[in-house]
Amino acid sequence: AAPDVMSAVLALEPASHVVELDDDYLDDIAAAFGQVVDSKSPYTSGHSARVALYTDLIAETLGLAPERRRWLKRGALLHDVGKLGVSNSVLDKPGKLDAEEWAAVQAHAAYTEAILSRIGAFAELAVVSAAHHERLDGKGYPRGLTAEQITLETRIITTADIFDAITAERPYRGAIPIPKTLEMMAENVGTAIDPVCFEALKQAIARLPA
């Protein structure tokens, strides 16, 4: 349960931070967190790593500086860490979720922010990563942010996350081919998906080897 996850995080938090962490070490920590989250369910295997890859490809296409791309890639690896607080019976459910189950799934975004905000090296990423289910039309969660409140970095992670969620196999359906995925995403450009990030995604995907 989420309170147990939070208790564990707080218990591990030192009284003072005296260790200087280099970028390579932070990359490794973020990747390890992502692997732990992804191993929670067979349907999320590799998800965080793929979202990080697509995030970096979009960021590169948009011309973000290398150091900013590296920072943002960590945010993508960590975006679903809050799912450690959501029951597998909900995450792996093949049918439609009821209201209580859907609320439990939505809570993972707030858990992500709570967990990352307690880790000094990742505190700056807490809001950026946790907001990946916010929408430009204000109908997202956990805060219902409007377009002007959603950073470019979050918009990039959101675009990458949606792309992987559709192209990956789910409990209730098989994987959807990339052309069909892009068609489905295009219907949500301007409401859930940033148009600039979507165009960058398409350009990035076109550059990938077949």
Describe each model-derived feature in a short phrase:
Residues 1-210:
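Metal-dependent catalytic cores of enzymes that make or break cyclic nucleotides
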